[in-house]
């Protein structure tokens, strides 16, 4: 399973990229607004850091304007993926953009049926939201499993991006459920790298080395 980072914070992206684990980036209007910067400016800078799919979301809710925005965003860089919300207007936009060879990521997926429609409309990626489904008592990972099974049975090429990831356990569950990608906040990526026994082991190694080869030896 590939790892994307879910943020518009360039510094976080730079730090995560230095770990050598990133395959792409996802952003959304809320994340862009948090940075207080122009969308195109942020996206272009992200593209200079990560050589992989970079999802940039449209803000219009009418399909013709979505298409127009998508075309403009796609001109920024070859790695741009147009992120479009799951709705009737969004499906229309995905259908047109996909026929033009523009990659799309249908977001705000909360059911396997939504994912099927998005895939058939031509979406490159679908993004089911784990955390938000969990919040309403509907295990998000079950939806990911359903989508993965359905895509496999019907040989659908659309890739699954597990989104709304809040914990390392979400990442593990997504990987085991068959998600192609998990898009993860920076803090969760860092949490994934840590374990109490690792810290204890490192401390012991250092103490043992100092004891055997310290300055006074």
Curated annotation (Swiss-Prot):
A Gene Ontology term for the protein's cellular component: cytoplasm
Any one GO biological process: pentose-phosphate shunt
Keywords from the UniProt entry: Cytoplasm, Pentose shunt, Schiff base, Transferase
Known pathway: Carbohydrate degradation; pentose phosphate pathway; D-glyceraldehyde 3-phosphate and beta-D-fructose 6-phosphate from D-ribose 5-phosphate and D-xylulose 5-phosphate (non-oxidative stage): step 2/3
Compartments it resides in: Cytoplasm
EC number: 2.2.1.2
Name of protein: Probable transaldolase
Function: Transaldolase is important for the balance of metabolites in the pentose-phosphate pathway.
GO molecular function: aldehyde-lyase activity; transaldolase activity
Catalytic activity annotation: D-sedoheptulose 7-phosphate + D-glyceraldehyde 3-phosphate = D-erythrose 4-phosphate + beta-D-fructose 6-phosphate
Main subcellular location of this protein, as a coarse class: cytoplasm
Similarity comment: Belongs to the transaldolase family. Type 3B subfamily.
């Amino acid at each position: 399973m590939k790892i994307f980072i879910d943020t518009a914070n360039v510094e976080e992206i730079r730090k995560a990229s230095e770990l050598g684990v990133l395959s792409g980036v996802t952003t959304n209007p809320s994340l862009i607004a948090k940075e207080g910067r122009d969308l195109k400016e942020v996206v272009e800078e992200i593209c200079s850091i990560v050589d992989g799919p970079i999802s940039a979301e449209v803000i219009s809710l009418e399909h013709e304007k979505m298409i127009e925005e998508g075309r403009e965003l796609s001109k920024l860089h070859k790695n741009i993926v147009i992120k479009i919300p799951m709705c009737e207007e969004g499906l229309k936009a995905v259908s047109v953009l996909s026929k033009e060879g523009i990659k799309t990521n249908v977001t705000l997926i909360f059911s396997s049926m939504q994912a099927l429609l998005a895939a058939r409309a031509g979406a490159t990626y679908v993004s089911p939201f784990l955390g938000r489904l969990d919040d309403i008592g509907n295990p998000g990972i079950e939806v990911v499993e359903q989508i993965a099974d359905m895509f496999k049975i019907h040989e659908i090429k659309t890739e699954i991006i597990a989104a709304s990831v809040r914990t390392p356990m979400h990442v593990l569950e997504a990987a085991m459920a068959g998600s192609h990608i998990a898009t993860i906040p920076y803090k969760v990526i860092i949490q994934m790298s840590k374990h109490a026994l690792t810290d204890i082991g490192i401390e012991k190694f250092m103490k043992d080395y100092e004891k055997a080869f310290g300055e006074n030896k």
